[in-house]
Amino acid sequence: MCIRRVDDAYAAPYQTVWGDGWVYVRDGRLVGVELPGEGQIDRAGGSPGGPAGGRAGGGAAEPGAADSDALTFWARELEAYFAGARTTWTAAEVPLEDMRLGVFERAVYEALLAVPAGETVSYGELAEMAGYPRAARAVGNAMAENPIPVVVPCHRVIRSDGTMGRYGNDPRWKERLLVHEGWSAAGREGS
């Protein structure tokens, strides 16, 4: 496995039929996921962007056992997802408490983890599920800032009119991931 140091985290690739993505860990915990083609690996001379757009370098060149184990675990988990063998993670499996999240973001991400693969909720519905019924716009901001897409499945959140809405650097990923999970656009409003 090709492991890179990025700021205070370590990065390793995971493979999919759509190309390689990157997983980031710090202190043995998942802190970032980049979808294939999303990061700076190919665009910046081999330096992944990292969970916060960081740069390669700094700190120990080799990860400790906890980081190495976490990189291997999460790379395999994401490869299993993209191979169709894994579709969801539970709140107990995702280290939200270690991700420097605010109370609101954590509540929203925990609620989102309960949305089954291939199903969608609107930003407003997710706000209600998280206990913030009037915070649909803030939920949209939390989705845009999600450091671990796919694991915290922000692609399952759509607009109330049934349209996809935005998604990272490439909005096509949202529908691609939903279809991968078995979702069908047939009968969707706004199509």
Language model regions located:
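Basic nucleic-acid-binding alpha-helical/helix-turn surface characteristic of O6-alkylguanine DNA
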Residues: 1-133, 184-191
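Gly/Ser/Thr-rich beta-alpha loop segments that engage phosphate groups in nucleotides
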Residues: 21, 120, 133, 142, ...
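Regulatory, non-catalytic segments
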Residues: 134-149
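Short Lys/Arg-enriched helix C-cap and helix-to-coil transition segments
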Residues: 150-157
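…primarily DNA-binding HTH/wHTH and HhH modules…
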Residues: 160-191
